[in-house]
Every structure is written in structure tokens, then in C-alpha cells.
Amino acid sequence: SSLDQNELTGIGSGEPLARISQCNAGLIKRDLRRQGKAAEKLRALSSEQLLDICKRAGDLFLHAELPLNGDGDSQTADQYISTLSQTSGLPHVLVRRNMQKIFTVFDGMHGILNGLMRGMDAGVVETGFGEHSGIPVHYSPTTNALGVVLPSNSPGVNSIWMPAIALGVPVVLKPGREEPWTPLRIMQAFIAAGCPAEAFSF
């Protein structure tokens, strides 16, 4: 754990709920130097494997008890809903709706990639070359990682970075101060479904 920590408390009760370690610039620079290897590990999986991982991760995100930290603690779906509601002030019903939106992205990743890639075969992500409407095309990621700064007031916004994993691009996530729960749960669902842990910096 870091010396620089953020204590999360319940909005109504003021009760301490979690203590979150904060990264310093040195740790971030160190992690960024490792992103090339993280990208290699993620891109070693085929497009089909990555899409299968997304399907499995969606079910895990919605229903499973997932790791919470490196100390063996875990969190059920109901605990996630309750904790997020307490730290963000969102009602349980809105948290559940956002969970369903995120599940829809996991479950519908093939269609999302189809839209992002304008109908090109997803296999072009792993080979780098393909054909679209009779025209040769080339796919080459312009970065080894996608950096994402997230808010505290909308769990559903996490769905915008999820396709990066299916495209073989690791993510560096800076969660909102009161809402580390959703990106952490998505990340743990991906890992439990078979995605390399190196694909995530959090």
C-alpha cells in the first residue's frame, strides 16, 4: 500500500468504507515503461479469444464474487451495488441499471467492434492486414496503452474504454475519487475470464 491514501466514507453516515492507495508519478512512469510487454501479452490472444473473454467477463461482472484487492478480500455483486451507492450517492436502482449497460457492452462486444471497424473482419486486429469492400486495409495500434480518467458520478461511462481490451490495447485507469468500484470490478471480471492481468494498470 502507498503512503498517500484516500479514505472513502459513506455519504450519509460518514462511516469509513475503504482506504485507497494513490499512485505517485514514479509508479506511473514505471508502469508506462512496461506497457509494451503488456500489449504483447494481450495481443498474443486471437480476436476470437478476446471476444470469448468479453462474453465470460460480462456474466462474471453481473453475478460473480470477484477479488477486491491483493489481500484476498472479495466483493459480491450485491456488495458492489451497496458500496457504490454509499460512496457515490447513486440509488441502488441506478447502479443496477448501469451494471446492465456495462453487461450489454461485454455481451455485445462483437457488434460494437463491427461498428467501430465499419464492418471489417475483427481478425484484422491480430494479423494487421485485411480487406474491406475489395480494398486492402492495414490495422496498426498507435499506442501501447489507452489512458482513461474516469468520473465518480456515472458507472456506465466505464463502458467506453472496454472495447480497447477487445482491440488488444491495454488500459491505464485513473478512477474517480469516490468511484473506484466499477472500473475495478470490470477489470477483475476481465482477468477472471482469462484476460492477462498485465493489460490493466489501476
What kind of feature is each model-predicted range?
Residues 118-202:
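Rossmann-like NAD(P) dinucleotide-binding subdomain of oxidoreductase/dehydrogenase enzymes
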